[in-house]
Amino acid sequence: MGSRVSREDFEWVYTDQPHADRRREILAKYPEIKSLMKPDPNLIWIIIMMVLTQLGAFYIVKDLDWKWVIFGAYAFGSCINHSMTLAIHEIAHNAAFGNCKAMWNRWFGMFANLPIGIPYSISFKRYHMDHHRYLGADGVDVDIPTDFEGWFFCTAFRKFIWVILQPLFYAFRPLFINPKPITYLEVINTVAQVTFDILIYYFLGIKSLVYMLAASLLGLGLHPISGHFIAEHYMFLKGHETYSYYGPLNLLTFNVGYHNEHHDFPNIPGKSLPLVRKIAAEYYDNLPHYNSWIKVLYDFVMDDTISPYSRMKRHQKGEMVLE
């Protein structure tokens, strides 16, 4: 657990990301894929039910012993809250109401944010669009770890701690890599979230509030679903920047595992990404992919060739249009 990883820097590349070229090729060959570029109204009802489910859980845990509060937060609440962050990912791509009702998606994202306990839906949308446009761009893509993360988390034990602390790194990394001025929507998101948290504490008590926050922190840290954070873009095979996952946890995560398909077609809702793979099978079936996020987490910690430095990175090119 104490041996150091062999990598001491990111994988600097001087080619463009592969997704734009593959998208053009696939659309030229299979123009029917354009019919999948439409919102998924089922998202609305699924998310409403998820919020109501967590509200019910808040009520149930208010009188439980603390050990059951924490157990419930990890065994149940973490799955709901991590899934909700991926619902917010869908909303960030306007998958709920479509591009023509962009603001409806922003308000709905704030609603979906409520049971997570920490305001982030508006900020996530801003940074996530940069991640798609400028994948791996130095100083722009905040999905890339900082140099400190790559330098410090360089043993199996430290990488294990890094996995546990993932939600904190995702929360604070943008402040160091690509800080942005606060927008009025972020202020509204924060006020709405803090008000909701206060109401939960006032009407249901401290145990419900702790359950909500613990569900988010535990669910985004050392949790099977959190394998997607590493599986998506960490370079387990040299030269491959994005990886898909085709295992059963896609059922809980709005098909976020179909990540090559998602980066090729970010305006297609997760529900339809398996159809993209089916239609253009020759483009995806031979790409390296995963069937277990748990194995991804294990390999990340135990493999001495993999670390937070295992990301492909690019220097900025020309003038960038940021969110």
Swiss-Prot record:
Changing residue 113 to D: In HLD18; decreased function in sphingolipid biosynthetic process. A motif (Histidine box-1) lies at residues 89-93. Ubiquitous. A motif (Histidine box-2) lies at residues 128-132. Keywords: Disease variant, Endoplasmic reticulum, Fatty acid biosynthesis, Fatty acid metabolism, Isomerase, Leukodystrophy, Lipid biosynthesis, Lipid metabolism, Lipoprotein, Membrane, Mitochondrion, Myristate, Oxidoreductase, Phosphoprotein, Transmembrane, Transmembrane helix. It comes from the Eukaryota. Myristoylation can target the enzyme to the mitochondria leading to an increase in ceramide levels. A motif (Histidine box-3) lies at residues 259-263. It is linked to Leukodystrophy, hypomyelinating, 18: An autosomal recessive disorder characterized by hypomyelinating leukodystrophy with progressive atrophy of the corpus callosum, thalami and cerebellum, and peripheral neuropathy. Clinical features include very poor psychomotor development, dystonia, severe spasticity, seizures, and failure to thrive. Has sphingolipid-delta-4-desaturase activity. Converts D-erythro-sphinganine to D-erythro-sphingosine (E-sphing-4-enine). Catalyzes the equilibrium isomerization of retinols. This is Sphingolipid delta(4)-desaturase DES1. It comes from Homo sapiens (Human). The lineage of its organism: Eukaryota, Metazoa, Chordata, Craniata, Vertebrata.
